[in-house]
Amino acid sequence: MTVHFPFQNSYSALPDSFFARVAPTPVAAPRLIKLNRPLAVQLGLDPNMLETPEGAEILAGKTVPDGADPIAMAYAGHQFGQFVPQLGDGRAILLGEVIDRDGVRRDIQLKGSGPTPFSRRGDGRAALGPVLREYIVSEAMYALGIPTTRSLAAVVTGEHVIRETALPGAVLTRVAASHIRVGTFQFFAVRRDTDAIRRLADHVIARHYPELLGTERPYHALLAGVVARQAELVARWLLVGFIHGVMNTDNSSISGETIDYGPCAFMDAYNPAQVFSSIDEMGRYAYANQPRIALWNLTRLAECLLPLFGEEQEKAVEQAQDILGAFPETFSKAYQAGLRKKVGLFTERDGDEALIQDLLDAMAKNQADFTLTFRRLGDAAGDPAADDARAEFMDPAAFDEWARRWRERLAAEPQSAAERQTAMNAVNPLFIPRNHRVEAVIQAAVNDDNYALFEELVKVLAKPYEDQPDYAAYADPPLPDQRVLQTFCGT
C-alpha cells in the first residue's frame, strides 16, 4: 500500500529561474519521531500510512512520493542589513502543494533533506536540536493563534551531521501557506527582471490575495495587503513576548506567517531590549525593534514592486511611501488593542495607553515575568484578594500603586469580575515554550534518544490558555541556574 499525497503543484509551473529542480538526498535509516496527526488529516493525508516505515522514508526524503515535483526555491535577502543577491533553499526542498480541507493551498517542504544548488558549501542537512525547536515553537505559535508555518513531522535520519561536533541528523516536514518571501522578490529585482517580478506578484495575488484580482491597481493593493498582515503579525509577537531573532528579508513571509524559527525565543522577565540570538550582536532584532525592522523589510519589498507601479518613477515612489505610511498606525492599533485586552479593558478610553505603559515600565524595572504577570492579572481581576501578580514584582509597592489606578479603571467596564477573568485568560497564555524547557527537551533527545519530555511539552503547549494542574510546573519561569541567555541558529 502506498502513501498518497494529493499534490496540485503551481510554483514549479513558473519559469525555471524561480527555482532549481533537485531531489532529496536519501538517508540511512529514517525513524519517525513525531507525526502531527490532526495536521495530516487537515492536509488530506492518511496519518496511519505516514506512520509506516514507507511514510517515514517519504518524510525523511529517502523516497519521493508520486506527484511530487521537488524544487529548491530561489531568493535573495538582506541578512542583518547586508544584501546577499543569491541565497535560496540551501537545505530545504519543496515537495509540492496540496489543497487542504478548507480549500487552502499549502506547501509541503522537507527541511534538512540534503544539498541543493543554493547550499553555498553547506551539507544541506539539519541537526536534531533545531528540528525539535522548530516543531515545538511553530506548533506553540499555532496554538496561541498566531499566523505561522506548521510542523507535520520530525524524523531522525540514522546519520550524523557535523557542526561544532557530531550531532544526530533529522528532517522536519514544514507546512506553509507558501514559502514566498520578501527575498524572493529581491532575487529578481537585483537582476532587473521586471517580467519575473510581475509573474511572481501575479502568482502571490492569485494565491494569497485573490480579492485583489481584477482591481484597478493590484500591485499597489498587494503591497498594502502585505503591509497590513506584517503589522498585525508583529503586534501579535509582541503581545506574547516572542522574539524572532533573525528578521532578515529572506525570513519575511509574503503570506503574513511567522517563518524560520532558528534562534527564536520567548521572554521570561520583561525587557524591551531583550536579545537571545547569538548572531544578533548589535541587537538589531531585539524585542522592541521588531516593528521597526518589519517596516524596513517592507520598504525593501516596495522597492522591488516600483517597476509595476507605473513608468513615472517619482510618482511610484510617492505611492509606495503612502502605502508604507500605513504601517505604524496599523501596528499600533493592533498592539494597543491587544494590550487593552491583556489588562481586561474591553472599551477604549483616554489614559488607557499611559496606564498600560506604566505597567510595562514597572515590569521592566522589577524584572517581572512577562507571561505570568498578565496571567496573574486575570486572577486579580476575578478576585481582588488574589495577589499572585504582585508577587512577580521585586518592589510590590510599585505594583500596588499601579493596581489601584487599574481597579479604578476596571470599575468603568461593563463586565462582571468572572466575565473579565475569562476574557483575560483567553488572551493571556499560561504556557509558552520557555527556553529552558525547550533546551531540556533537546538535550534529552540528542544525548539519550529520549523523547518523553518532547512529547509532554508539545502536549502542554497545545492548550496554552487552559489551566493544566498536572503540568503546572511548565508555567514556571526558570530558576537562576536554568536561564538560557543565548539561542543558536543551528545551521
From Swiss-Prot:
ATP binds at residues 88, 90-91, 111, 123-124, 174, 181, 260. Its EC number is 2.7.7.-, 2.7.7.108. It is an enzyme of class 2 (transferase). The keyword Nucleotidyltransferase applies. Mg(2+) binds at residues 251, 260. Keywords: ATP-binding, Magnesium, Manganese, Metal-binding, Nucleotide-binding, Nucleotidyltransferase, Transferase. The active site is at residue 250. GO terms for molecular function: AMPylase activity; ATP binding; magnesium ion binding. Its cofactor is Mg(2+); Mn(2+). It holds the Pfam family SelO. It catalyses: L-seryl-[protein] + ATP = 3-O-(5'-adenylyl)-L-seryl-[protein] + diphosphate; L-threonyl-[protein] + ATP = 3-O-(5'-adenylyl)-L-threonyl-[protein] + diphosphate; L-tyrosyl-[protein] + ATP = O-(5'-adenylyl)-L-tyrosyl-[protein] + diphosphate; L-histidyl-[protein] + UTP = N(tele)-(5'-uridylyl)-L-histidyl-[protein] + diphosphate. Belongs to the SELO family. Nucleotidyltransferase involved in the post-translational modification of proteins. It can catalyze the addition of adenosine monophosphate (AMP) or uridine monophosphate (UMP) to a protein, resulting in modifications known as AMPylation and UMPylation. This is Protein nucleotidyltransferase YdiU. It comes from Bradyrhizobium diazoefficiens (strain JCM 10833 / BCRC 13528 / IAM 13628 / NBRC 14792 / USDA 110). The gene is ydiU.
